[in-house]
Amino acid sequence: ITRKPAVCLVGPEGFANAVPAMMEAWGERSPVIFVTGSSTLKRQGAGGFKEIDDVAIAEPLTKYSVSITDGERINEFVDRAYKIAVNGYPGAVHLSLPVDIMFSSFDENAGRQERPFDLTAQAPARAWPEP
């Protein structure tokens, strides 16, 4: 109704419970940003207990699914996820955040030297033109 996305923050163990919500958001064309925790960067790919490829599972259920492996680029990925969730047909997007990055601190302007443009509010694009 408002075209503003909801945010669902899920820990690593709760990802399986978020999958039905992703399917529902996809079916209802609801803009939802799912931020899920995953195993630490050091332990990814080691076959640890409860380690799953959440990005691959969420990919067919969302408009965008990505794992953030560089904490200084969080702003960039969140901005992209927001735009994708609300533009065109609204829908769910998924950001996977390793636990070690999730509990780290980063400067608000981190990574700005790589993308020196200002992040300003933009009107959302419409799925169809004004009548």
Regions found by a protein language model. Give the residues of each.
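N-terminal alpha/beta PP-like core and its mobile active-site loop of ThDP/TPP-dependent enzymes
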Residues: 1-131
